[in-house]
Amino acid sequence: MQWTNPGHQFDAIGNDLRNFQNIYIYGASDIGKYILKCVTFLKVEISFIDKDLEKQQKGVEGYQVYSPEEFKEKCAEHDDGFIVVFTVNRSNYLNLAKEFIRDGYRENVDFFFYDVFEKFYLNILSVYKFNKIFVEQLSLMVTTYCTLKCKDCIISMPYQKEKRHVPLSELKKDVELFFSKVDFVRYFGPGGGEIFLYPDLDQFLEYVLSRFSKQIGEVLLISNATVLPNEKVLRIIKKYNLTIRISNYDNVKGWLEKRNKFVSLCEENGIVFREQKEEYWLDMGWNSEKKNVKLAYQLFEQCEMPCREFSNGIEYYCLHGHFAEMAKGIHEDQGLDFTKEETDKRIILEYNMGYLKKGFLNSCIRCNGYFGVNNKRIPVAEQL
């Protein structure tokens, strides 16, 4: 989207989302608990609504659970306003939404479906109601070294001209600046390359988690499982109860043996890990012919890339596009400079919601887009 009124793009929506003091999460299931993690940083009164008698008696995650009948009674008592986030399935939501509308409540003002709330409205109400910034996902690149040479690496790692481990002092400076402006990140992680190659990973994780753990929902440690974490890193992972996500590359020669050693090490140390096996990768199209401006604009509107990247005081909207440009020696997408005074919370909100000066990134001109818009499937982890 193209910026037309910077700092005020969401005024109409945001002003409608100011009038509440309580959040009710309808459904105390795993999705409900996920939404809980997304809203606790707001420091507002939160309760669950659920039909389960045991949950009503014991509570969930330390929070009160009301029955639907009790909630209706409480509705009449609220003079200070509330919102409801439904975490039920879509068909149940539609039925409940009809009831709420009949009772005079407004969809996407007084009540929300969880997916729309988390991806859109939470960002806006966080700023307009609480003056706080919520970011879905952010990566800080710690190293451009990797043990694999994937021809179609989504962040063009084999093609980076400068191979380096980012100095710890540089990372600390970026972390301090970022969290001085952003109040909560749902998913935060060191990026690579292969993160377990980074020699100061233990110090980086300790620095981040000892200072900013309350501003982070989950730390993402994504590895190709070819490098065993050292004792110092293992100690930090156990101390903060972190989970390692293993990218499965069992089609790469010799990978499975290394993976088995990696998994054994995790099991021996009681470290939780999850394996993710992709059936295919996407051809991002970095070497394809240029699109015209209209097509680039349309691609950006549809893409909804969730992965942000932060380095040298600048947030880049698209992690993948930024590193593709770096590999080509191009620096056209300037990003959002957090060191400037005019970069206030509403500007950060709008940037993260997809508002740009031109309405698209220069990298979109050569990109095929992310999942949902890109149908160009290619083999996983084909090596150079």
Residue map of PLM features:
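Hydrophobic, well-ordered beta-alpha structural blocks that scaffold small-molecule cofactor pockets
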Residues: 1-128
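A general structural motif
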Residues: 20-22, 43-45, 78-82, 133-137, ...
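Short hydrophobic segments within beta-strands
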Residues: 25-26, 49, 85-87, 141, ...
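Accessory C-terminal segments flanking Radical SAM cores
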Residues: 31, 287-384
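Generic structural signal for small/hydrophobic residues in well-ordered secondary structure
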Residues: 83-84, 142, 146, 313
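N-terminal pre-core extensions flanking Radical SAM catalytic domains
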Residues: 104-162, 336-384
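Conserved alpha-helical substructure of the radical SAM core
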Residues: 118-221, 228-231
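Conserved AdoMet/S-adenosylmethionine-binding subsite of the radical SAM
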Residues: 198-312, 316-321, 326
